[in-house]
Amino acid sequence: MEQKIKKLTSILFLLLCVPLSAENKKADLIESEAHAILIPGSGTYSKKISTQNKEAQQFFDQGLRLAWGFYFPESIASYLEAARHDPDHPMPYWGMAHAMGPNPNSRYSGMPDDPKGEGFKAIKKAMDRIENASDMEAKLIQALHILYDKDTYPDAKQRDQAYLAAMRK
């Protein structure tokens, strides 16, 4: 019970400290002030990325865990913070694009794909930095780019299928 209270208190503190909406945070703005804090008790899963910056890695991991928990605004804030620590690494921008949508699951509830275009801006930034990615990171970035590629795949179902095929590689 005490662990739950600590976790909820930490999340509440984060909600009070960072903007609650991706609409309020432009994916192309990486400012000097902090966008997020490391939340105690938010998990230990780590997906090593090719950054040499310890803080960027920690915030990337937190962003991934929060996105998997459907805490998308907090996830985006964590990815923004990772990008602040390593602005040339593409994976924080990949994370932002991943958390901002489009999301094949959300379409079933009628949510629009990337209504403000912020996710597209983020994946474009990741693509612009892809030379700084490992081979696996580059494949993840290229696969996620497909979900935003309305020129090649005008139909959302086509994009979903192409994305799934790319992720299977």
Language-model regions: role of each:
Residues N24-K169:
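Short coil/linker segments at helix-helix boundaries
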